[in-house]
């Protein structure tokens, strides 16, 4: 049995088309969705991510602002820029690209973003809303993973055991909360887990999000499981790969996301969805 692919590019195209329609409708009422992207320093990977985000905004008919600053920018200067964007009515979403230079406190910057414009879903208010089931912006990567599950008919996960490998604030923790909200029984595994394979072999759904190659191999996978690979790594030939041993696991799993072309495009798509929702809320 070879697993069916969950195509993140195809699902993204569908969802982005829906966002573009919503943007057109909102613009007809006099409001253009606006996203500000702030980049500090010249990290090559960050530059690529930022470029892709700005292009996706423009393709959806959004107003986008890209602010690039030298790595020598002070924390106080960056916080002042974020406050200015908080007060700009044409901007509905603010994204500060991480990582920031070492002298700037990521947490302080994220907490300065207005929760009403926190389209990355990283603010403590957004995380708290997710925890208690209130309305708030969901972190884009796990939100995209949930949409991928929905696309294969897995919206209500009652009776399903989901294992999340990774406990980051950006993916692992919010992923677990979203799976829990969908009625899954959730296990979170990490570097302190004694027997990872014993956990994953019981899992109907595995989300791998640690940034380490081959963290999930075929012998660790339950036949027919759904495997979502959030990882972004390079193999020995320098090619992009995920956290999952794709060639091995696809012979055991029922569904699997590829890398590239899986979770990656969905992350940007859900950023657009969040920005669209922020603009609609602001417009009333």
UniProtKB/Swiss-Prot annotation:
Example GO molecular function: methylenetetrahydrofolate dehydrogenase (NADP+) activity
Record key words, sorted: Amino-acid biosynthesis, Histidine biosynthesis, Hydrolase, Methionine biosynthesis, Multifunctional enzyme, NADP, One-carbon metabolism, Oxidoreductase, Purine biosynthesis
Superkingdom of origin: Bacteria
Reaction(s) catalysed by this chain's protein: (6R)-5,10-methylene-5,6,7,8-tetrahydrofolate + NADP(+) = (6R)-5,10-methenyltetrahydrofolate + NADPH; (6R)-5,10-methenyltetrahydrofolate + H2O = (6R)-10-formyltetrahydrofolate + H(+)
Keyword Cell membrane: no
EC numbers: 1.5.1.5, 3.5.4.9
Residues holding NADP(+): 166-168, 191
InterPro entries assigned: Aminoacid_DH-like_N_sf, NAD(P)-bd_dom_sf, THF_DH/CycHdrlase, THF_DH/CycHdrlase_cat_dom, THF_DH/CycHdrlase_CS, THF_DH/CycHdrlase_NAD-bd_dom
Pathway listed: One-carbon metabolism; tetrahydrofolate interconversion
One GO BP: L-histidine biosynthetic process
One Gene Ontology term, aspect cellular component: cytosol
Family named by the database record: Belongs to the tetrahydrofolate dehydrogenase/cyclohydrolase family.
Assembly notes: Homodimer.
PANTHER family referenced in this protein's UniProt entry, alphabetically: C-1-TETRAHYDROFOLATE SYNTHASE, CYTOPLASMIC, C-1-TETRAHYDROFOLATE SYNTHASE, CYTOPLASMIC-RELATED
Function comment: Catalyzes the oxidation of 5,10-methylenetetrahydrofolate to 5,10-methenyltetrahydrofolate and then the hydrolysis of 5,10-methenyltetrahydrofolate to 10-formyltetrahydrofolate.
Record's protein name: Bifunctional protein FolD
Phylogenetic classification of the source organism: Bacteria, Pseudomonadati, Pseudomonadota, Betaproteobacteria, Burkholderiales
